[in-house]
Amino acid sequence: MKQLLDKDRFGPWALVTGASSGIGKELSRQLAANGINVVMAARRIDLLKEVGDGIEREFSVEFRAVQVDLSEEGFIDKIKDATRDLDIGLLVSNAGAARAGEFVNLALKDLHDQISVNVVAHMELVRYFAPRLVKRARGGVMLIGAMGASHGIPYMANPSATKAYVLAFGEALHFELEKHGVAVTVLAPGLTDTAVIPELFVDPGAIPMKLLSVAQVAAEGIAAIQANKSLCVPGALNRFMNRVVPASITRKMMAKLLKK
């Protein structure tokens, strides 16, 4: 795998949340391929250790697995304890929560949990690690958002609103932290081939575009933070659609495809 990331700038350790599967797992793998040790955080500790063992064998880096539920109050204390002795050069705040459905029918607890994971966790993680990165005068923060985050998606009203927060938060931080030598990138993928797709869509086969691979999403995200781009929308077609397709058309298309 081609080396894309400056490990002297973004290493020796990275923290990746939501690292047990999907984009987070692949980001952990590609960071390790660039010689960076990885703290992998998620709820499923057995799966984390399995993924970490594979990364350690393949790339000869170190890993540390942290079992944590980002929807729980006080989660940040577990992260602090797990990383206190490490020099974290890159925060990858990837974990997210989403459930499709008509807003009036969704459980209030699920809605609160989505905000806890998709908004509060990003904020608390950055608030803890950003001062340390500023003190280092190098490093980076990658926040995982979503393509079209500012549109507002029917049957994903709450999750899409939280992704709009991630976009605004990340682009503001990019401006604030750049002068301190800290890169900030919002990685905003479109529909990606992960286990989440069947959970959200009535018929994944009816999606009228090819799903992105996690490998492409991770690689473009890593290249973007190396270049300190404020926003990365992976895939040329997705970038084109993000620029030119009206939000009203996106809403209608997604409303037909998502589970109610």
Model-found features: residue ranges?
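Residue(s) in the substrate-gating loop at a strand-loop-helix junction
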Residues: 146
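Conserved NAD(P)H cofactor-binding loop of Rossmann-fold oxidoreductase domains
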Residues: 94-99
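Conserved glycine-rich cofactor-binding loop
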Residues: 13, 20-22
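Substrate-binding pocket helix/loop in short-chain dehydrogenase/reductase
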Residues: 102-103, 107-115
